[in-house]
């Protein structure tokens, strides 16, 4: 594994091998399980520029999300989409490459809604700068958004610029029964939730409220439910989905589970129980077939004409 310390070394590392893939802290290893020379961003870390008054920051790809969150918190700001795997050591570049967002996506959108600019190395080994460093920049194609969720197939991300939001004055989490009467009452409320989540079991609904303290207290009184510790959202962001246990085939239906996340606009389900179970798998796992788009193929051809970076079909 190559570990460059500067963006110039990063570009040279990409040019050094016919097939490469940039990796961060390794918190999502199944998404980078391809045959290629790995280029680590662990030494490409640090906040390059931060303008609290402009609500933007620029940081190197290997910067831990926890470090970024701490710096933003000092100025009462944050990334509203709730990046995943922060405590596990997830990096800014990894958040962009995977495009994964947490509970805050329900209200604020995902990673692609906050990225402004990027510096990355294309398949020809060129260090390119695309996008801008200001929120109002709207010139040209919004290519940085193509890199969100690309898993490194268009280029190796070296530096990213994001916009941020002011941190709300207060937050409050409610646990409600997941039944028609409660949902009807909640839907009629005049307040907009910050995040929603249905934990495994489907018996309860978690609602996060954010804003001025008195306002969310009034909202909670109107909606009802039980106030719970807001740390539950941190556990959701760390995606504690994996478990290991010895069971017999007859016991499988008992362990069938579904997690419906309004926050991430996605539902993970295993149904019927015996048919959705994968015990072993050496390759990255995908749900369904990957749709092909002419625009995506054209971008790949323009940025990586020789296929230096692995594609999703590899």
Spans of features found by a protein language model:
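N-terminal glycine-rich flavin-associated loop
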Residues: 1-22, 41-88, 100-133, 169-176
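Conserved active-site and cofactor/substrate-binding residues in soluble primary-metabolism enzymes
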Residues: 5-9, 63, 67, 87, ...
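Short beta-edge/loop segments at beta->alpha junctions of small alpha/beta modules
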Residues: 24-30
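Conserved glycine-rich FAD pyrophosphate-binding loop
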Residues: 32-34, 42, 202, 225-314
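FAD-binding subdomain of flavoenzyme oxidoreductases
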Residues: 88-194, 201, 205
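Short amphipathic alpha-helix segments
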Residues: 176-196, 217-222, 244-260, 271-274
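Terminal amphipathic helices with adjacent charged low-complexity linkers/tails
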Residues: 208-226
């Amino acid at each position: 594994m190559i570990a460059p310390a500067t963006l110039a070394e990063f570009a040279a590392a990409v040019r050094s091998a016919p097939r490469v893939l940039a990796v961060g802290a390794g918190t999502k290893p199944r998404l980078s399980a391809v045959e290629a020379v790995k280029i680590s961003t662990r030494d490409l870390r640090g906040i390059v520029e931060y303008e609290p008054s402009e609500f933007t920051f620029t940081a190197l790809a290997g910067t831990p999300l926890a470090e970024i969150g701490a710096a933003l918190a000092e100025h009462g700001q944050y990334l509203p989409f709730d990046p995943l795997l922060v405590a596990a050591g997830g990096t800014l570049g990894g958040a962009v490459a995977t495009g994964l967002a947490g509970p805050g996506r329900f209200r604020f959108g995902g990673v692609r809604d906050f990225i402004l600019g990027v510096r990355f190395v294309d398949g020809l080994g060129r260090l390119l700068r695309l996008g801008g460093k200001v929120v109002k920049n709207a010139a040209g194609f919004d290519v940085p958004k193509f890199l969100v969720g690309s898993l490194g197939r268009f280029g190796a991300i070296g530096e990213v610029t994001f916009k941020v939001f002011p941190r709300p004055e207060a937050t409050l989490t409610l646990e409600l029964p997941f039944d028609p009467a409660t949902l009807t009452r909640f839907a009629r409320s005049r307040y907009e939730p910050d995040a929603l989540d249905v934990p495994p079991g489907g018996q309860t609904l978690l609602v996060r409220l954010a804003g001025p303290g008195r306002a969310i207290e009034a909202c909670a009184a109107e909606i009802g439910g039980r106030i719970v510790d807001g740390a539950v959202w941190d556990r959701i962001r760390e995606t504690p989905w994996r478990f290991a246990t010895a069971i017999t085939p007859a016991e499988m239906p008992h362990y069938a589970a579904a997690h419906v996340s309004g926050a991430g606009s996605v539902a993970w389900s295993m149904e019927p129980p015996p048919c959705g179970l994968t015990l072993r798998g050496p390759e990255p796992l995908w749900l369904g077939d990957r749709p092909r788009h002419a625009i995506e193929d054209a971008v790949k051809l323009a940025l990586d004409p020789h296929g230096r970076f692995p594609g999703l079909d590899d």
